[in-house]
């Protein structure tokens, strides 16, 4: 199995984290941000864009950009309130009362689980890129007050994204893991989690590696988006009063209002007043209209007074369920971006009478806790025991439509509990078990999780048969219900998945479609990368050509310039016409030309470096004799590319050898590229060649008829006079090597022959010069 990550799938933003070296690390996305907007869109080409790219095109493409879908997961259309339906895109219902999101661009309906799966896949891909290995498993967080249907919908989203969901963990519990991982002492902490779409509050006892949830409460339809909506309504009403136009009826204007409201809410957390300017928000017969106004913090708090009151109720309930008073709370941990609002912080201070702990990042702490839970499951984190609870009560429908609770809310999980039921009529052979979740007394007011029948019960009077019903909740909060007839031993069970709304066939179909989108994304990314690399190659080629021209002159690069310009034009034309085959061919040719250019430049620099370092060596050693390997090994023509000129090899001891100043003979089959012929060589070494002194010396005796030509002067000789081509007699007139201005290094010594002069009588008189 691959790497397991922790994912905070949020209403507004999502975060992914992983355990590395025993510590949780938040992974930044491709845009460099540690949080990824929970936004999915389809642009005008029908391509999928997720995260920040999806958010950027929301104003111009509101009907094909989907946000806040977490609120719709695991719910029926009839469960939605009018406010929750007020989004810029289209929400519709199918024939089974399921929620569908309409995408006009693709002419297709998506389930909320599919949209969330696209976000999860994006996060998993970012984690795979960071880790260098495929991510196959995940621990995903959900609001603590999510019911079983919403939890199962989250698992379905992970499955559609191609992930194995190892654990579903409550967001406040994950936050407590991140906060209390390094806490040694036992503390009672209250986690206040106000996200974009949901609100949760939990009380936990943390210490000695044990995280025990005492109670949890919340509101799955209350979050930061509701505060944004108050600003949207305020702006729309103000504009309606002034211009007689309701901006909420225009999808594009509504999207702009929503973004401006969120920005204003964020700014009011740090300043007392904010400006809201939306030019050209709409147009009437009188022309374009603009929205310009100011919103103060006090006005904002007045707009949201009832929302703050709604925040108080779950806090009171959770303290009551935990059996604690506010003064018994040791720490308050704030989670979610909504907790940055001063009115929310003020509520916590007044209610708990304690300053909130702000040592954790409210946007990242949940994902960090999920990563820790992933480390626990993976064996990387040890000595941690997490005891979570059920957020809502589980029970059965009994006679009269009353709900019988088997598992009260805040029951520690995993848990198994059984109870005995009987028939309601005489000779009843079939019992229908209706599983419910909720806190209301009547079954019709609670959430129906599923139904199943137990048949084969022997006929008997009413109340005689005994049917044992067992509720089994695993660590993920997923419920399995089993009914067993104690008389016959017949048994029937159900794993509550009908609550996920999606059938197994629908989930499999969505998995295949998600894989198709992933393949399209890969192809699109590869195509974009290819186009970007081709354009970058043209810029690189032109830049390199300019550098080489400055170093070696335009004559050196004339043939390369023609090739580079032609191929760059070919690449740009191929990009414009979207001709990939032609683009690949031109790109490969340009890479070849650049390779040859860089190779030729490298050879020229090698020649220069060899001459430079050899000169330094001669300066310090005084060795200017004719065994100079640098010139004896001057390379022959290196390859066909260098112009086909043959310089030959030179023998300083053979006067019949071709002179270096002779024009080289062209070689058959000359290759491409600029010619490095005599003209170029003579340019490079002109001054040096003219300064050399030709000295003809006897070579191994006059009888051989040879001469010795080293063509170079000794640095000790005084050649200031104009007669620089004078031939010196080898034995009598050769200048002394040691006579530097009359004072040799070792005193006045007889003139010595050069190091490479022919041996006299088999002995070199200069062998002991430096010993």
UniProtKB/Swiss-Prot annotation:
<feature type="compositionally biased region" description="Basic and acidic residues">
    <location>
        <begin position="708"/>
        <end position="734"/>
    </location>
</feature>
<dbReference type="GO" id="GO:0031072">
    <property type="term" value="F:heat shock protein binding"/>
</dbReference>
<keyword id="KW-0143">Chaperone</keyword>
<dbReference type="GO" id="GO:0016887">
    <property type="term" value="F:ATP hydrolysis activity"/>
</dbReference>
<feature type="modified residue" description="Phosphothreonine; by autocatalysis">
    <location>
        <position position="198"/>
    </location>
</feature>
<comment type="function">
    <text>Acts as a chaperone.</text>
</comment>
<keyword id="KW-0067">ATP-binding</keyword>
<dbReference type="InterPro" id="IPR043129">
    <property type="entry name" value="ATPase_NBD"/>
</dbReference>
<dbReference type="GO" id="GO:0044183">
    <property type="term" value="F:protein folding chaperone"/>
</dbReference>
<dbReference type="Pfam" id="PF00012">
    <property type="entry name" value="HSP70"/>
</dbReference>
<dbReference type="InterPro" id="IPR018181">
    <property type="entry name" value="Heat_shock_70_CS"/>
</dbReference>
<dbReference type="InterPro" id="IPR012725">
    <property type="entry name" value="Chaperone_DnaK"/>
</dbReference>
<dbReference type="InterPro" id="IPR029047">
    <property type="entry name" value="HSP70_peptide-bd_sf"/>
</dbReference>
<feature type="compositionally biased region" description="Basic and acidic residues">
    <location>
        <begin position="630"/>
        <end position="652"/>
    </location>
</feature>
<dbReference type="GO" id="GO:0005524">
    <property type="term" value="F:ATP binding"/>
</dbReference>
<dbReference type="GO" id="GO:0051082">
    <property type="term" value="F:unfolded protein binding"/>
</dbReference>
<dbReference type="GO" id="GO:0042026">
    <property type="term" value="P:protein refolding"/>
</dbReference>
<keyword id="KW-0346">Stress response</keyword>
<dbReference type="GO" id="GO:0140662">
    <property type="term" value="F:ATP-dependent protein folding chaperone"/>
</dbReference>
<keyword id="KW-0597">Phosphoprotein</keyword>
<protein>
    <recommendedName>
        <fullName>Chaperone protein dnaK3</fullName>
    </recommendedName>
</protein>
<dbReference type="GO" id="GO:0051085">
    <property type="term" value="P:chaperone cofactor-dependent protein refolding"/>
</dbReference>
<feature type="region of interest" description="Disordered">
    <location>
        <begin position="624"/>
        <end position="771"/>
    </location>
</feature>
<comment type="similarity">
    <text>Belongs to the heat shock protein 70 family.</text>
</comment>
<keyword id="KW-0547">Nucleotide-binding</keyword>
<dbReference type="InterPro" id="IPR013126">
    <property type="entry name" value="Hsp_70_fam"/>
</dbReference>
